[in-house]
Amino acid sequence: MKVSAFTFIKNGQILGYPFLQSIKSILPIVDEFVINCGESEDDTLSMIRSINDKKIRIIESQWNDVMRDRGYVYGQQKMIAQYNCTGDWAFYIEGDEVYHEDDLEKIKESMELYLNDANVEALV
């Protein structure tokens, strides 16, 4: 079983998001983490690079300001990251979410349990 995680982030430092903790919280159970990083006005990109984990794959993108209306740009940027995932499971995590270490084994067990179940499309 191969597990991908994915997210998108822009100006995470300015916005005060715990994006580094977010990324690190799920890294132990994934095989790759795709991060779509928009052109930030802060050190978001260099902070992500400082994690220095071989599982992390960074995609740099430009956000289309025309799509900001009603948050369309967020959906677009999320999908850019998701489409670059190569795992059997694609685990979406936002820059302000952090998973507790005690839950990681339960999450992994559920993914293993339902990996080949055609009736299960997602875990929530």
Where are these regions (language model features)?
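Active-site-proximal specificity loops/subdomain of glycosyltransferases
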Residues: V3-F6, K10, Y17-P18, D43-Y92
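Short, well-formed alpha-helical segments that are part of the catalytic scaffolds
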Residues: T7, G12-E32
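Short beta-strand/loop segment that forms part of the nucleotide-sugar
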Residues: I26, D31-S40, E60-S61
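Short, well-ordered coil/turn elements that cap or connect secondary structure elements
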Residues: P28, I51-D53, D117
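The conserved acidic donor/metal-binding loop of glycosyltransferases
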Residues: E94-V98
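Conserved donor-nucleotide/metal-binding helix-loop-beta segment in metal-dependent transferases, i.e.
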Residues: D102-V124
